[in-house]
Amino acid sequence: RRALEDAQEDAEAAANIISGHTLRMEERKKKADAAAEARVKLTMDVGALDNRIRLLTEMEKDYEGFNKAVKLVCQAQNNLRGIHGPVASLMKTDGKYSLAIEIALGAGLQNIVVDREEDAKSAIAFLKQREGGRATFLPLTAIRGEELRERGVENEFGFVGVASRLVRFDPKYTQIFNSLLGKTVIAEDLDCGIAMARKYRNAFRIVTLDGQVINRGGSMTGGSTSRSAGVLSRAAELERLNGRASEMHRKLEEARAAEEASRRELDAAQYELTTAETQRRAAEDEVLRLQGV
C-alpha cells in the first residue's frame, strides 16, 4: 500500500511539474514570436533602406540630375585631363542647409572644376566635337573669390552664416567656393533677410533656409521648392541614410541574436516539458501496475 501511495504522489508531482513547464513554454513561445516579429520588421526596414541607398548611389554614379554636357565630361574623365568634377560633387553640407545652398549656387552646382584653362579648352572642344551641349568650367588657376567683408553682419538677428562657410570641401577648392558663395548670406527666414538687406543697403545676396532669395540690388525671388529634387538634397539624404544604415544593420544583428536565444530557450522548455510528461506517464503506469489493473 505504501508503494502505491508513493507512486500516486510521484504522478501528482509530475502533473504539477508539467503545469509549470507548460506555463514556461507559453511564456517562451510568446517571447520567441515577439523576437521573430521584431526581426522580420527590422529585416524589411533594412531592406527598404538599403534599396534607397542603392538607388541614390546609382543616381550619383550616373550623374542623375546633371545636364547632358556635364554627364558627358564627367563620364569621359579618363580621356580628358584635369577634370575634378561638378561643384555639387566636390562639397558637402548639412541637410538643414542643403536647400539654401542649392538655391544659392543655382546653375553653379553644375559648373565643372578643372586644373587649368587648357583643360577647360580641351573639354569644350570635346563637347563641341560630340555636339554634347554646353558647360561652364572653373579653372583652379584662374578663379579667385572673396568672402563677405561687411562688419557686424554675423551679429544680425536671423543670421545663419556666410554660405561658403556652411559647406565642407577640400581646401584646394577654397577660391572656387569663395567665388560662388563667399558673398551670400544664409538667413533664418525672409523677415530676417529683409531686415538685413535694408540695413546693409542690398550690398550682398541673401538666401533663406527655405530657399527664398534677396538679390544684390534688392530684387527678390521665391516661392515653393521641392526639398528632394536637387543633387545636394540627394547627397545629403545619401549621407544621412548611410549613417543610419550602420545603426540599423547593428540592430538587425541584435534582433537575430535575440531571436536565436529565445528559440534556444523555447527548445529547452520543450525538452523539459517532454521529459516531465515521460516521467508522469511512467508514474501513472506504476500506479496502474500496483493497483493490479
Task: List the predicted regions and their residue ranges.
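Phosphate/adenylate-binding "loop-and-lid" substructures adjacent to NTP/NAD/dNTP-binding pockets
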Residues: 68-77, 84-85
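Extended alpha-helical coiled-coil stalk/rod domains used as structural arms in giant protein assemblies
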Residues: 1-55, 59-66, 196, 202-293
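A general boundary/transition motif marking the beginning of the first structured unit of a protein
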Residues: 41-44, 57-61, 75, 89, ...
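Globular "head" domains of long coiled-coil molecular machines
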Residues: 79-223
